[in-house]
Amino acid sequence: MQSSVLKIGGSFLILVFLLGLAFSIQPFNSKIDAETTLVDEVGAYKPENRRLTDATYLVAVRTQMPNVSADMVRGWLSDFLQTSEHYKWWHPTDHVWMDWENKKPSEIYGASHLVHEYIGGEMGKLRIQFVAPEEFFGRDPNDEKTFVLCARVGLLDAPINIARMCHIVRNIEGGAEMRSRFWLGHVAARKGNEEIASPVDLIGNSWLNRRF
């Protein structure tokens, strides 16, 4: 009798666990809306911070860049940015250290930017892997007046990606406007430059984990 009760109790606990796991996991039902950054009207891109329906988090930022062009930013990242001192010029307070991985001269896609920087007052050690814009847009929106830079953002000290990001720099009168978009909570195990299937995905992309 006691054995039967234990079996029933054990089965019940397993059922509760599986149901809890099932209800906690959601697919990415909020689209990575990179196209939003390509709005034509100057100043129309909306800065915002908000939780999406699948519990991932969206951060959108608009930065005015007087006397700067999209091509200048392209050259800065593709060729000029080589040292931690250069990196600090971009943000003297928050940017601390940098290095490159898989970087080729005059190329940015396929390279990974290894950085230490403060984010909200806390030190973040990140691996920012720049990818071809087709991964986000399904096409390449780069042209003479637009520089598009997209990336998978991961932890530097562990083979795990945690976010997606996209910067769009567009020429406007008197300079450029940079539209930045970050999708936080896209978790994936990483091997080299490839994202791989792993239990990390199952746990990291659960609704509860994204919330907390």
Regions found by a protein language model. Name each.
Residues 146-207:
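Beta-strand/loop substructures that line and gate deep hydrophobic ligand-binding cavities in soluble
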Residues 1-17, 21:
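N-terminal Sec-pathway targeting helices
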Residues 23, 27-107:
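Hydrophobic ligand-binding cavity/cleft-lining segments
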